[in-house]
Amino acid sequence: MRLIFITLLALILATVVGLGATWMTATRGTDLGTLRIGAWIARPKTGTADVDPYSRASIARSGELPIGTGDGVAFSATTDDRKRPLDGRCDVVVSGVTPAARFWTLTLYDTKGRLVANSLQRYGFTSQEIIRGADGAFELRVASRSRAGNWLPTGGIERYALMLQLYDTPVGVATRTQRDAPMPSITTVGCP
Protein backbone atom coordinates (compact mmCIF):
# COMPACT_ATOMS: atom_id res chain seq x y z
CA MET A 1 0.00 0.00 0.00
CA ARG A 2 2.79 2.38 0.89
CA LEU A 3 4.60 1.64 -2.40
CA ILE A 4 1.44 2.45 -4.39
CA PHE A 5 1.00 5.74 -2.49
CA ILE A 6 4.64 6.80 -3.08
CA THR A 7 4.41 5.84 -6.76
CA LEU A 8 1.19 7.83 -7.25
CA LEU A 9 2.67 10.81 -5.39
CA ALA A 10 5.79 10.69 -7.58
CA LEU A 11 3.67 10.52 -10.76
CA ILE A 12 1.49 13.44 -9.66
CA LEU A 13 4.53 15.51 -8.69
CA ALA A 14 6.29 14.72 -12.00
CA THR A 15 3.14 15.67 -13.95
CA VAL A 16 2.74 18.98 -12.10
CA VAL A 17 6.42 19.89 -12.54
CA GLY A 18 6.40 18.89 -16.24
CA LEU A 19 3.21 20.78 -17.06
CA GLY A 20 4.38 23.79 -15.04
CA ALA A 21 7.72 23.91 -16.86
CA THR A 22 5.97 23.59 -20.22
CA TRP A 23 3.52 26.39 -19.36
CA MET A 24 6.35 28.68 -18.18
CA THR A 25 8.36 28.03 -21.34
CA ALA A 26 5.39 28.49 -23.67
CA THR A 27 4.25 31.73 -22.02
CA ARG A 28 7.56 33.35 -21.13
CA GLY A 29 9.76 31.93 -23.87
CA THR A 30 13.14 30.31 -23.79
CA ASP A 31 16.59 31.27 -25.01
CA LEU A 32 16.82 28.03 -26.98
CA GLY A 33 17.74 28.94 -30.57
CA THR A 34 17.67 32.70 -30.00
CA LEU A 35 19.86 35.28 -31.65
CA ARG A 36 20.64 38.32 -29.47
CA ILE A 37 22.09 41.55 -30.80
CA GLY A 38 21.95 44.27 -28.15
CA ALA A 39 18.38 44.56 -26.86
CA TRP A 40 17.03 42.80 -29.97
CA ILE A 41 16.07 39.11 -29.85
CA ALA A 42 15.20 36.87 -32.81
CA ARG A 43 14.39 33.21 -33.25
CA PRO A 44 15.57 32.59 -36.83
CA LYS A 45 14.36 28.98 -36.93
CA THR A 46 10.72 29.72 -36.06
CA GLY A 47 9.77 29.89 -39.73
CA THR A 48 11.43 26.55 -40.56
CA ALA A 49 10.78 22.86 -40.09
CA ASP A 50 13.68 22.85 -37.58
CA VAL A 51 11.77 24.95 -35.01
CA ASP A 52 12.26 23.77 -31.42
CA PRO A 53 9.20 22.37 -29.59
CA TYR A 54 9.08 25.27 -27.11
CA SER A 55 8.94 27.89 -29.85
CA ARG A 56 6.33 25.79 -31.64
CA ALA A 57 4.18 25.74 -28.48
CA SER A 58 4.61 29.50 -28.04
CA ILE A 59 3.59 30.12 -31.68
CA ALA A 60 0.54 27.87 -31.30
CA ARG A 61 -0.47 29.68 -28.11
CA SER A 62 -0.05 33.21 -29.52
CA GLY A 63 -1.37 32.57 -33.03
CA GLU A 64 1.69 34.33 -34.45
CA LEU A 65 2.51 33.76 -38.10
CA PRO A 66 6.33 33.74 -38.22
CA ILE A 67 8.35 34.95 -41.18
CA GLY A 68 9.79 32.07 -43.20
CA THR A 69 13.59 31.82 -43.29
CA GLY A 70 13.70 32.52 -47.01
CA ASP A 71 11.69 35.71 -46.48
CA GLY A 72 13.48 37.32 -43.54
CA VAL A 73 13.74 37.45 -39.77
CA ALA A 74 11.84 39.23 -36.99
CA PHE A 75 13.58 40.84 -34.01
CA SER A 76 11.73 41.99 -30.92
CA ALA A 77 12.79 44.19 -28.01
CA THR A 78 11.06 44.66 -24.67
CA THR A 79 13.98 46.46 -23.00
CA ASP A 80 16.40 49.22 -23.91
CA ASP A 81 20.14 48.62 -24.30
CA ARG A 82 20.58 48.95 -20.51
CA LYS A 83 17.99 46.19 -19.90
CA ARG A 84 15.31 48.61 -18.61
CA PRO A 85 11.77 47.68 -19.69
CA LEU A 86 10.33 49.84 -22.47
CA ASP A 87 7.88 52.21 -20.78
CA GLY A 88 5.30 54.09 -22.85
CA ARG A 89 5.38 57.03 -20.46
CA CYS A 90 9.09 57.61 -21.16
CA ASP A 91 10.87 58.99 -24.21
CA VAL A 92 12.83 56.27 -25.99
CA VAL A 93 15.14 56.82 -28.95
CA VAL A 94 15.70 54.04 -31.49
CA SER A 95 18.65 55.12 -33.61
CA GLY A 96 21.33 53.89 -35.97
CA VAL A 97 21.17 51.63 -38.98
CA THR A 98 19.60 48.28 -39.70
CA PRO A 99 21.26 45.22 -41.21
CA ALA A 100 21.19 44.93 -44.99
CA ALA A 101 17.62 44.16 -46.04
CA ARG A 102 15.50 44.84 -49.09
CA PHE A 103 12.68 46.12 -46.84
CA TRP A 104 11.99 46.42 -43.12
CA THR A 105 9.22 47.43 -40.74
CA LEU A 106 9.44 48.67 -37.14
CA THR A 107 6.16 48.27 -35.26
CA LEU A 108 4.97 49.02 -31.72
CA TYR A 109 2.95 46.35 -29.87
CA ASP A 110 1.56 46.00 -26.38
CA THR A 111 2.75 43.11 -24.20
CA LYS A 112 -0.02 40.87 -25.57
CA GLY A 113 1.07 41.37 -29.19
CA ARG A 114 -1.63 43.85 -30.20
CA LEU A 115 -1.08 47.16 -31.97
CA VAL A 116 -1.07 50.09 -29.55
CA ALA A 117 -4.08 52.39 -29.98
CA ASN A 118 -3.21 56.05 -30.43
CA SER A 119 -4.93 59.16 -31.79
CA LEU A 120 -2.53 59.45 -34.74
CA GLN A 121 -3.21 55.84 -35.79
CA ARG A 122 0.50 55.37 -36.47
CA TYR A 123 1.65 51.89 -35.48
CA GLY A 124 5.08 51.74 -37.06
CA PHE A 125 7.50 52.85 -39.76
CA THR A 126 8.91 51.17 -42.84
CA SER A 127 12.30 51.50 -44.49
CA GLN A 128 10.58 53.40 -47.31
CA GLU A 129 9.07 56.19 -45.19
CA ILE A 130 11.47 56.83 -42.32
CA ILE A 131 13.49 60.06 -42.45
CA ARG A 132 17.24 59.39 -42.53
CA GLY A 133 20.39 61.43 -42.09
CA ALA A 134 23.03 61.89 -44.80
CA ASP A 135 24.88 58.82 -43.47
CA GLY A 136 21.80 56.60 -43.84
CA ALA A 137 21.17 56.42 -40.09
CA PHE A 138 17.80 57.27 -38.60
CA GLU A 139 16.50 58.46 -35.25
CA LEU A 140 13.03 57.44 -34.16
CA ARG A 141 11.35 58.83 -31.04
CA VAL A 142 8.96 56.49 -29.24
CA ALA A 143 7.00 58.65 -26.80
CA SER A 144 3.55 59.48 -25.50
CA ARG A 145 3.83 63.17 -26.45
CA SER A 146 4.31 64.56 -29.96
CA ARG A 147 7.90 64.84 -31.22
CA ALA A 148 9.39 66.32 -34.39
CA GLY A 149 10.64 63.97 -37.10
CA ASN A 150 10.17 60.23 -36.82
CA TRP A 151 7.72 59.86 -33.92
CA LEU A 152 5.91 56.71 -32.87
CA PRO A 153 3.17 57.39 -30.27
CA THR A 154 2.82 54.98 -27.35
CA GLY A 155 -0.59 56.10 -26.17
CA GLY A 156 0.98 56.27 -22.69
CA ILE A 157 0.82 52.50 -22.07
CA GLU A 158 3.04 51.20 -19.31
CA ARG A 159 4.93 48.45 -21.18
CA TYR A 160 5.40 47.75 -24.86
CA ALA A 161 7.50 45.82 -27.34
CA LEU A 162 9.15 46.86 -30.59
CA MET A 163 9.22 44.46 -33.54
CA LEU A 164 11.79 44.95 -36.30
CA GLN A 165 11.04 42.71 -39.28
CA LEU A 166 13.77 42.44 -41.89
CA TYR A 167 12.77 41.07 -45.30
CA ASP A 168 15.21 39.50 -47.75
CA THR A 169 18.21 39.73 -45.42
CA PRO A 170 21.24 37.51 -44.76
CA VAL A 171 20.85 37.98 -40.97
CA GLY A 172 19.65 34.80 -39.33
CA VAL A 173 20.65 32.71 -42.35
CA ALA A 174 24.39 33.28 -42.77
CA THR A 175 26.13 32.35 -39.53
CA ARG A 176 29.00 34.79 -40.03
CA THR A 177 26.74 37.84 -40.20
CA GLN A 178 24.49 37.11 -37.25
CA ARG A 179 26.14 38.61 -34.17
CA ASP A 180 28.03 41.31 -36.11
CA ALA A 181 24.93 42.74 -37.79
CA PRO A 182 24.42 46.46 -37.11
CA MET A 183 21.20 46.91 -35.14
CA PRO A 184 19.56 50.15 -34.03
CA SER A 185 20.30 51.11 -30.45
CA ILE A 186 17.43 51.61 -28.00
CA THR A 187 17.98 54.32 -25.37
CA THR A 188 15.61 55.65 -22.72
CA VAL A 189 16.30 59.40 -22.65
CA GLY A 190 13.76 60.64 -20.15
CA CYS A 191 10.76 59.78 -18.03
CA PRO A 192 8.19 62.21 -16.59
Over which residues does each language-model region extend?
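A compositional/structural signature for long, glycine/proline-rich flexible linkers
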Residues: 1-192
